[in-house]
């Protein structure tokens, strides 16, 4: 996900990339060009919904299909457009669509017109059964413990509680953003303490910028897995992993173990660079897990990566190791 004044600027370091056998491609890739920070959800009606950041950072788009592959050619609708003045007027980033109860919500990041790096988390609500219809009501800023640079809100439930994971700059911290977690009292309200899950401590998390962002959760095999993205939004971008026992207290930082190495990085063999800001969904069979992410088809970028539009939405099967942990493999090659 792009970042603002705390992290603005171009990267000059050249990152390493993974070397592995080229995986079999089960899907058409890229799925959608020039759509970054992709979030795909499968609703109970069997339909898939895709939203993502657009290069202009000025609107929230949505498309739907009965199949994952169909999202690539589905008609795209603009469901919300930035304000021209005041709040929510700039840097519309990383929307996520969630159905909570009988209501749709979109979580996204935005900044005011007069301070475009004052990025915070905002919430939209739509009571219609169809998220393309009805009215998207602005429910305001989702307040965290600090009024600082914050983005990439991701909500999930576990053992009857709803949680929000997000990225934020911690006052006094020596990093751009870390990952935080809190329980939710309602779709746009946190309750109780917020805990720090991770800060950029390894070299691979600090290439260009010291960043942990873009959390996403998948629960399998008695564990809660939270992926996140690290480093600058160029070819250095990669994914890390946090793991908690499903029986543990997720609000205890000690419940979470952090993988010391990235779990998903760019690949010279397949020609994909800077993969990250992922989400998870399932295939049409209801069993096969699918990794959703963005990547660029080249490593070199002229100028600020924020201004390079070619982060494309991609999907591929997510495998599982015999020990019950996810096997991300490497980004699949383009098929088109």
Language model: regions and residue ranges:
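Sec/Tat signal peptide C-region and signal peptidase I cleavage site
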Residues: 17-19
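Carbohydrate-active catalytic/glycan-binding domains of CAZyme proteins
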Residues: 4-10, 21-336
């Amino acid at each position: 996900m792009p970042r603002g004044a705390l992290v603005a600027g171009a990267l000059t370091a050249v990152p390493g990339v993974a070397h592995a056998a080229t995986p079999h491609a089960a899907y058409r890739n890229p799925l959608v060009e020039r759509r970054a920070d992709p979030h795909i959800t499968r609703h109970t009606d069997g339909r898939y919904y895709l939203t993502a950041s657009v290069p202009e950072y000025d609107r929230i788009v949505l498309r739907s299909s009965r199949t994952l592959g169909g999202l690539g050619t589905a008609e795209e609708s603009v469901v919300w457009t930035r304000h021209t003045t005041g709040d929510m007027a700039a840097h519309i980033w990383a929307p996520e669509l969630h159905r909570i109860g009988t209501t749709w919500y979109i979580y996204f990041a935005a900044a005011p017109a007069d301070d475009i790096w004052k990025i915070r988390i905002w919430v939209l609500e739509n009571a219609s059964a169809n998220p393309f219809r009805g009215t998207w009501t602005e429910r305001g800023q989702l307040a965290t413990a600090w009024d600082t640079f914050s983005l990439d809100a991701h909500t999930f439930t576990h053992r009857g509680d709803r949680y929000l994971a997000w990225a934020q700059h911690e006052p006094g911290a020596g990093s751009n953003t870390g990952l935080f977690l809190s329980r939710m009292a309602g779709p746009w309200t946190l309750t109780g303490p917020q805990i720090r899950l991770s800060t950029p401590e390894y070299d691979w998390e600090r290439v260009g910028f010291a960043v942990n962002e873009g959390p996403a959760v998948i629960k399998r095999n008695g564990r809660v897995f939270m992926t996140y993205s690290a480093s600058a939004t160029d070819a250095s971008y990669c994914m890390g992993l946090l793991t908690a026992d499903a029986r543990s207290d997720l609000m205890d930082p000690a419940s979470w173990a952090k993988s010391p190495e990235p779990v998903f990085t760019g690949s010279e063999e397949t020609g994909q660079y800077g993969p990250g800001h992922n989400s998870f969904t399932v295939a049409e069979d209801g069993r096969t897990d699918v990794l959703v992410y963005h990547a660029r088809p080249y490593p070199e970028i002229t100028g600020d990566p924020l201004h390079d539009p070619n982060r494309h939405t991609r999907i591929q099967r997510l495998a599982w190791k015999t020990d019950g942990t996810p096997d991300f493999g490497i980004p699949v090659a383009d098929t088109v």
